From Swiss-Prot:
The gene is rlmL. Keywords: Cytoplasm, Methyltransferase, RNA-binding, rRNA processing, S-adenosyl-L-methionine, Transferase. This is Ribosomal RNA large subunit methyltransferase K/L. It comes from Idiomarina loihiensis (strain ATCC BAA-735 / DSM 15497 / L2-TR). HAMAP family: 23SrRNA_methyltr_KL (MF_01858). The lineage of its organism: Bacteria, Pseudomonadati, Pseudomonadota, Gammaproteobacteria, Alteromonadales. It catalyses: guanosine(2445) in 23S rRNA + S-adenosyl-L-methionine = N(2)-methylguanosine(2445) in 23S rRNA + S-adenosyl-L-homocysteine + H(+); guanosine(2069) in 23S rRNA + S-adenosyl-L-methionine = N(2)-methylguanosine(2069) in 23S rRNA + S-adenosyl-L-homocysteine + H(+). It is found in: Cytoplasm. SUPFAM superfamilies: S-adenosyl-L-methionine-dependent methyltransferases (SSF53335). Residues 43-154 form the THUMP domain. Specifically methylates the guanine in position 2445 (m2G2445) and the guanine in position 2069 (m7G2069) of 23S rRNA.
Length: 704
């Protein structure tokens, strides 16, 4: 009898144990990430051929208690490797685990390789060669605590490699996981019917439906594999293996002939459907699986009842989040409307996505797709599903529609193609919705502390689901930004690698906005009228823009014909952005872009440069490493304004703004400094922000 460790993905140990019981083995013991078995050679070949859930099959060659590196070397060098394989065969070593002496698996693999080579040489044989790509023999060695185990990888490669998937989609589903999903979904019950029906409406490259077909037609998962790790093992029995192989071929022939059901896969990507057909052809299943190009959210049920199993897109990338969310919602409606009397299994990367189906599951299983945590949910549509009321959408949809009808006319008249259509008008839906040409950007506000996170999430998702019916926007142009507290340089870092960059128009100016890569888009729309004031009043003036961000205020001052415009900001990213904004407007003149801490720069330039207009729009709070200290605008605004006054011409003005909600300007402190404050907040708030009166504070400050 031989001792094997049959490995599987974590979470599948129980299923693997049940499967191994079917092989009439005398000993099966379940453990973490697999099972130990004892088997004779014919049983071992049978497990290798027929296990659908195992990922590897390791024949244990030896194990030993070791306490040092020397003891590891001694055990592996003294083992008779020439009894396992010939010196003229190539091999490779897979090493896992480690201890105080072996901290890196690469070092461990090299150590084992040297021991094997030394053993062959010491036994009078030639040195065997290494082949990492296509070895004849694969040796697996593990060190865990003080235990050393060495094994022959019996199958030679991952058992998920069935031989049919030479090509795959962007997010491949491992064949072993696909088989486990089908078992969890209840495929055995479906196959007991006279005419079973199995359907995957998101089939991709066909893995789930091909695995289902292999089960339905008694096609062994190992039948189409080209290479096995035991073929060059000294104890391999070609006759026994031939018998197992011949039996598998005969069972498939009979199973295919006797199958009377319907297997179908569809996908909206023609390229992937073509791959799926090719994959099915490699295992001779192309004639029994129907593939078609179709939209899963608008597909017909292929029969009155059956088993639907699918792995819809996860939408891992930021730009895909909303589109994926809405896809699940539409798919959930389609299931409820069209697949009554069906059993459903959906694999998703996120519990929130499963919630969007609006179906009640009777069972959920956490699984791993490679290293990615996923969730499998089962739904029984043969039983009545609850109605999830959607009447609450009416108030939100009506409000957004009403706002859009009113404000779109106003925006067209003003020459604007970016504006705010909704700003937490209904408190339960706590977000801002901005129009950027034909895109919609949803910015979530932080929920009150007394609102549970799950409730806030549900409300946000519900808002997103309602947008496509409330606004003239396609779902792939809805972008979600989720607010998180920013620290250090996070606010300057890219949030996504998939850019959506537009050029928008504001009172004749062109500005670059980036809807996806950063927390903000590059344009603070609530300051639109302040920028217009600069456009109207800065001709022939010297203008300083502090905390300049993407220099949109500087652009309007320059367009007004300002004699000089200086923009100062700590962020190189934003200043480069500002330079692009100037280039978009074909502005050439005395324009400077200075990367510096505004406090330090003003102290250095005090008395050297004077300006007619200083636009001062600092952040509410900042603790950037580039700053000499922290900035709290409530605490520090008097000192900041007094410092700026040192660069102000005698009859100049400071345009001071900030976005702190409960900001209170210290008129007494500024009065003592000889400064006069004119509160222009209400006049500076544009039409589309009037519902949010605390969006910013704006003051014109001059010498008394």
């Amino acid at each position: 009898m031989y001792r094997f460790f049959i490995a599987c993905s974590k979470g599948l140990e129980g299923l693997l144990f049940d499967e191994l019981q079917e092989f009439n083995l005398s000993h099966v013991k379940q453990t973490l990430a697999g099972c130990y078995i004892e088997a004779d050679l014919q049983q071992a070949y049978t497990v290798a051929m027929w296990s659908r859930l195992a990922s590897r099959m390791l024949l244990q060659l030896g194990e030993k208690e070791v306490s040092s590196l020397d003891e590891i070397k001694l055990a592996l060098t003294q083992f008779s490797w020439s009894k396992v394989f010939d010196a003229n065969r190539t091999f490779v070593v897979d090493f896992s685990g480690g201890n105080d002496d072996i901290r890196h698996t690469q070092f461990g693999a090299q150590l084992v390789k040297d021991c094997i080579v030394d053993n062959f040489r010491n036994s009078g044989f030639e040195r065997p060669s290494i082949d990492k790509q296509d070895p004849d023999i694969r040796i697996a060695v593990r060190v865990h605590k003080d235990k050393l185990t060495w094994s022959l990888d019996f199958t030679g490669d991952g058992m998920h490699k069935r031989g049919y998937r030479l090509q795959q989609g962007e997010a491949p589903l491992r064949e072993t996981l696909a088989a486990a999903i089908l078992v969890r979904a209840g495929i055995k019950n479906e196959l007991e019917k006279d005419e079973p029906v199995i359907f995957d409406p998101f089939c991709g490259s066909g893995t789930l439906v091909i695995e289902a077909a292999m089960m339905a037609m008694d096609h062994a998962p190992g039948l189409s594999r080209a290479h096995w790790g035991f073929l060059f093992w000294h104890e391999h029995s070609p006759q026994l293996w031939h018998d197992v192989l011949e039996q598998a071929e005969q069972r498939f022939k009979e199973g295919k002939k006797n199958f009377k059901g319907h297997l179908k896969g569809s996908d909206n990507n023609p390229h992937l459907v073509a791959k799926a057909k090719d994959n099915a052809k490699r295992v001779l299943l192309h004639e029994v699986i129907e593939f078609e190009v179709a939209d899963a959210t608008n597909c017909e049920a292929p029969a009155e009842s059956g088993l639907l199993v699918c792995n819809p897109p996860y939408g891992e990338r930021l730009g895909e989040a909303v589109e994926t969310l809405l896809l699940y919602r539409r798919f959930g409606r389609q299931l409820k409307d069209t697949f009554q009397n069906w059993h459903i299994a959906v694999l998703a990367g996120d519990e929130q996505l499963l919630k969007r189906l609006k179906l009640r599951s009777h069972k959920k299983y956490p699984l791993l797709n490679g290293a990615i945590p996923v969730n499998l949910a089962l739904y029984d549509l043969t039983k009545e599903q609850p109605d999830f009321a959607e009447s609450q959408a009416d108030d939100l949809v009506n409000r957004v529609k009403k706002n859009h009808a009113k404000l779109s006319k106003w925006a067209n008249k003003e020459g604007l193609d970016c504006w705010r259509v909704y700003d937490a008008d209904i408190p339960e839906y706590n977000a801002a919705i901005d129009i950027y040409q034909d895109y919609v950007v949803v910015q979530e506000y932080a929920a009150p502390k007394d609102i549970p996170e799950g409730v806030a999430n549900d409300r946000l998702w519900f808002m997103l689901e309602s947008l496509s019916s409330a606004l003239p926007v396609s779902e792939d142009k809805i972008i979600l930004k989720r607010r998180q507290r920013q620290s250090g340089k996070q606010q300057y870092e890219r949030q996504s690698q998939d850019s959506t960059v537009l050029t928008v128009n504001e009172y004749g100016a062109k500005f670059e906005v980036n809807l996806t890569d950063y927390l903000d888009t590059g344009l603070f729309m609530d300051h639109r009228l302040v920028r217009k004031e600069l456009l109207d009043k800065c001709e022939e003036l010297d203008v300083l823009n502090l905390f300049a961000y993407t220099c949109t205020a500087s652009v309007q001052a320059a367009r007004a014909g300002a004699a000089r415009v200086v923009s100062v900001d700590m962020s190189k990213t934003y200043l480069k952005w500002g330079e692009r904004n100037f280039a978009l407007n074909r502005l050439r003149g005395d324009y400077q872009f200075i990367q510096a801490d505004c406090f330090i720069w003003m102290r250095e330039q005090r008395g050297k440069q004077l300006f007619d207009v200083i636009f001062l729009d600092p952040p509410t709070f900042s603790n950037s490493k580039r700053m000499s200290g922290t900035l709290d605008i409530q605490r520090d605004h008097v000192g900041l304004i007094k410092t700026a006054t040192g660069m102000l011409k005698e009859d100049g003005v400071i345009l001071f703004s900030n976005n702190r909600k409960k900001f209170r300007i210290d008129t007494e402190g500024l009065d003592k400094a000889g400064l006069e404050v004119n509160d222009q907040t209400q006049a500076s708030i544009p039409e589309d922000f009037k519902r949010h009166k605390g969006i910013h504070h704006y003051y014109i400050i001059s010498r008394a």
